[in-house]
From Swiss-Prot:
Name this protein carries in UniProt: G1/S-specific cyclin-D1
UniProt source species: Canis lupus familiaris (Dog)
Lineage: Eukaryota, Metazoa, Chordata, Craniata, Vertebrata
Keyword Repeat in record: no
Sequence similarity: Belongs to the cyclin family. Cyclin D subfamily.
Residues that span the membrane, as ranges: none
Gene from which this protein is expressed: CCND1
Length: 295
């Protein structure tokens, strides 16, 4: 044929229309209550784990984030997988040789919960450089869901972001960029052990405040001023405003440290590695779009 047909259609994920009934106060109250039932222990490194160190968790968490990004998983998959990881480590001692297997299993289950086409066991084994087998992953999956008592629909910070945005008088184009930046902060927080003690609602609220601050939106909208937005969100999630400010400042400090180490690594990889060894929590890797945030 002289003229070939050119198909320009792009496959898009089919999503349900937004339902305002799912964003009302009754649902938010239920979510705030539900997040308490899926909280990990904040002291599992001292009380439960004998071989696993925070730095090891950081390495596995960064690897999990990279896998989720490369596979273009839904934003909720990685935080949900980290919730499973933290809760399992709160209950069961794990040998360091099996930590990557646990991380892969957590992604495997989380993708089943959030993806229309979940990650396969074979694909996850490839990402471990075939250090684990599919049958090992399936066995660990059974152990994981039993230890978690099949309570797999855990609340994550992403569940709260939409509630906050729906209550904020902000233009839709600004909501989209706030959402994207807040999601990036959530992913960054999930890799750091210091945020295990913060409930998902507080991480979400702190991420939204940090996103608004970084985008300098408070100058054009008085509602988005730092103190007013912090007071508003603290009332929404029923927490002390000072606690929310502390969480938001911790997020910004984590971002700055992550950016600084990423820049050092690009200029002097050896010096960056030495600095990582000095810190218990390795913050060298940054999630997508973090470098676009200005604070």
């Amino acid at each position: 044929m002289a003229h070939q047909l050119l198909c320009c259609e792009v496959e898009t994920i089919r999503r349900a229309y937004p339902d305002a009934n799912l964003l009302n106060d009754r649902v938010l109250r239920a979510m705030l209550k539900a997040e308490e039932t899926c909280a990990p222990s904040v002291s599992y490194f001292k009380c439960v784990q004998k071989e696993i160190l925070p730095s090891m968790r950081k390495i596995v968490a960064t690897w999990m984030l990279e896998v989720c990004e490369e596979q273009k998983c839904e934003e909720e998959v990685f935080p949900l997988a980290m919730n499973y990881l933290n809760r399992f480590l709160s209950l069961e001692p794990v040998k360091k040789s099996r930590l990557q297997l646990l991380g892969a299993t957590c992604m495997f289950v989380a993708s089943k919960m959030k993806e229309t086409i979940p990650l396969t066991a074979e694909k996850l084994c490839i990402y471990t450089d075939n250090s684990i087998r599919p049958d090992e992953l399936l066995q660990m999956e059974l152990l994981l869901v039993n230890k978690l008592k099949w309570n797999l629909a855990a609340m994550t910070p992403h569940d709260f972001i939409e509630h906050f945005l729906s209550k904020m008088p902000v233009a839709e184009e600004n909501k989209q960029i706030i959402r994207k930046h807040a999601q990036t902060f959530v992913a960054l927080c999930a890799t750091d052990v210091k945020f295990i003690s913060n409930p998902p609602s507080m991480v979400a609220a702190g991420s939204v405040v940090a996103a608004v601050q970084g985008l300098h939106l408070g100058s054009s909208n008085s509602f988005l001023s730092y103190h007013r937005l912090t007071r508003f969100l603290s009332k929404v999630i029923k927490c002390d405003a000072d606690c929310l400010r502390a969480c938001q400042e911790q997020i910004e400090a984590l971002l700055e440290s992550s950016l600084r180490q990423a820049q050092q690594q690009s200029l002097d990889p050896k010096a960056a590695e030495e600095e990582e060894e000095e810190e218990e929590a390795d913050l060298a890797c940054t999630p997508t779009d973090v470098r676009d945030v200005n604070i």
